């Protein structure tokens, strides 16, 4: 009974309970590690509430008691989805993990919008520029290009010079 009650907590991955001969109960719990939070639009077609994405691509419920500091995502891609176990969804997992594990990008990106086709738009914390990341392929190379843009262009042109930065093309950063 204890195991079943603990497993109902949204962030619990697994639970084992046992007692020793003296009657002491021990409970071992493994938690899901959330790497992103899906904020669903009330206008969208999804019947699902906001959820977390775990490190293995499962969607898990939010908790009223705890809110982890993780990246916020949303967009038409998530409408009707129950997990990221399809081919395109599995490409998003390393993308979210990359940001979650990189303190610089975790601080620089406030939101990620995922289009129906899986294309990604980054909303930075500073400025009004939108960053068209494209599909989540060549993740490290695209973030290297963006970092160079931050180092070389932003100091000279300012945060609000460009409305769009495109990273989706190989060996190019296109600014509009």
Residue ranges and their predicted role:
Residues 3-8, 13-176:
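Charged, solvent-exposed interaction patches on well-folded alpha/beta domains
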């Amino acid at each position: 009974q204890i195991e079943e009650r603990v497993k109902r907590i949204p962030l619990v991955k697994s639970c084992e309970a046992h007692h020793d001969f003296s009657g002491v109960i021990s409970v071992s719990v493994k938690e899901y590690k959330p790497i992103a939070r899906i904020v669903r639009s009330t206008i969208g077609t999804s019947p699902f509430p906001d959820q977390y994405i775990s490190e293995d691509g499962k969607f898990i419920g939010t908790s009223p008691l705890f809110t982890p500091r993780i990246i916020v995502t949303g967009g038409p891609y998530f409408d009707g989805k129950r997990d990221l176990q399809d081919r395109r969804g599995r490409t998003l997992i390393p993308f979210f993990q990359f940001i979650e594990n990189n303190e610089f990008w975790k601080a620089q990106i406030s939101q990620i919008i995922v289009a129906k086709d899986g294309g990604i738009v980054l909303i930075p914390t500073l400025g009004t520029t939108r960053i068209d990341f494209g599909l989540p392929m060549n993740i490290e190379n695209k973030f290297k290009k963006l970092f160079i843009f931050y180092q070389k262009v932003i100091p000279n042109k300012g945060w609000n010079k460009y409305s769009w930065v495109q990273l989706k093309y190989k060996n190019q950063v296109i600014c509009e």
